[in-house]
Amino acid sequence: MIEADRLIQPQLQGQDDVIDRAMRPKLLDEYTGQDDTRAQLKVFIQAAKNREEALDHMLIYGPPGLGKTTLAMIVANEMGVNIKSTSGPVLEKAGDLAALLTNLEAGDVLFIDEIHRLSPVVEEILYPAMEDYQLDIMIGEGPAARSIKLDLPPFTLVGATTRAGALTSPLRARFGIPLRLEFYNVKDLSTIVSRSAQVMGLAIDSEGAIEIAKRSRGTPRIANRLLRRVRDYAEVKHDGAVTKKVAEHALDLLDVDGEGFDYMDRKLLLAIIDKFMGGPVGLDNLAAAIGEERETIEDVLEPFLIQQGFIQRTPRGRIATNRAYLHFGMIKPE
């Protein structure tokens, strides 16, 4: 299993959730990046408010750390309603979901993180709730059991997932607003870093923010985590202000290189280059070669490397691109 404390992992770790909450934008106008998604949401939210209706059910998907939870909270704030949050693995029984649904008020947002991990029993309860705002529940056991229908107030279900393909077709079809979040560009990430530094009361110049953004793998959660570590370095080794040079020294010390790669990324790329002559190599062989699970490679390591053009995924397996060779000062064989 991949190290739980990997500095550039996009999943939550340690105090991330508490600190991220303090830095989260509250409204769409404060939200940086994801321009297409933001523009769509503004229209959908305004239309729902004009009609005095609950917003349509929404599925937010994409790699971890890009702001799915933040967007769900922004939706609730923009609509002026309450939000109740839970996650797929927590909803073990139909009664768990029923308890949440029956406590919703008209227009409220129910946010389910990791919605692809809902159990089939819970998912069945969700279908009529999403479509007809009705809750079908069984009362009693055995021959005396009977089904009753409860009316629910109109509500908005916001589901978040890193694996949209793992959702069942019936569940996916019930979301009227699908939103895909993409990795952030350096410009948007540097804006996020500067905003977070301001919230933290940290002096940072534009070049320092850009340097952190470059090494943040297109992910705001990683950018904020690196910013906190660079702040530590700046306070101990310098005067507390973050410049480009301070950021470079701090991140080099943390073994996060100019592309945002750490030991695990370099290990994966070098395995393809050295052990499998650049590929193609199958996922199972690659997982065995670096001592990781295939899910870790698919869900954590690969997405950014593919998006940045360092790995190519083909029907025959993974291939290291010319860019991967150049990263290590090598020339790809013809």
Curated annotation (Swiss-Prot):
Residues 4-184 are annotated as: Large ATPase domain (RuvB-L). Pfam families: AAA_lid_4, RuvB_C, RuvB_N. ATP binds at R24, G65, K68, T69, T70, E131, D132, Y133, R174, Y184, R221. GO terms for cellular component: cytoplasm; Holliday junction resolvase complex. Transmembrane segments: none annotated. It catalyses: ATP + H2O = ADP + phosphate + H(+). Keywords: ATP-binding, Cytoplasm, DNA damage, DNA recombination, DNA repair, DNA-binding, Hydrolase, Nucleotide-binding. CDD domains: AAA. One of its GO terms (molecular function) is ATP hydrolysis activity. DNA binds at R294, R313, R318. Residues 258-334 are annotated as: Head domain (RuvB-H). It is an enzyme of class 3 (hydrolase). It is found in: Cytoplasm. Its EC number is 3.6.4.-. Residues 185-255 are annotated as: Small ATPAse domain (RuvB-S). Mg(2+) binds at T69. One of its GO terms (biological process) is DNA repair. Belongs to the RuvB family. HAMAP family: DNA_HJ_migration_RuvB (MF_00016). The RuvA-RuvB-RuvC complex processes Holliday junction (HJ) DNA during genetic recombination and DNA repair, while the RuvA-RuvB complex plays an important role in the rescue of blocked DNA replication forks via replication fork reversal (RFR). RuvA specifically binds to HJ cruciform DNA, conferring on it an open structure. The RuvB hexamer acts as an ATP-dependent pump, pulling dsDNA into and through the RuvAB complex. RuvB forms 2 homohexamers on either side of HJ DNA bound by 1 or 2 RuvA tetramers; 4 subunits per hexamer contact DNA at a time. Has 3 domains, the large (RuvB-L) and small ATPase (RuvB-S) domains and the C-terminal head (RuvB-H) domain. The head domain binds DNA, while the ATPase domains jointly bind ATP, ADP or are empty depending on the state of the subunit in the translocation cycle. During a single DNA translocation step the structure of each domain remains the same, but their relative positions change. Homohexamer. Forms an RuvA(8)-RuvB(12)-Holliday junction (HJ) complex. HJ DNA is sandwiched between 2 RuvA tetramers; dsDNA enters through RuvA and exits via RuvB. An RuvB hexamer assembles on each DNA strand where it exits the tetramer. Each RuvB hexamer is contacted by two RuvA subunits (via domain III) on 2 adjacent RuvB subunits; this complex drives branch migration. In the full resolvosome a probable DNA-RuvA(4)-RuvB(12)-RuvC(2) complex forms which resolves the HJ. This is Holliday junction branch migration complex subunit RuvB. It comes from Shewanella sp. (strain MR-7).
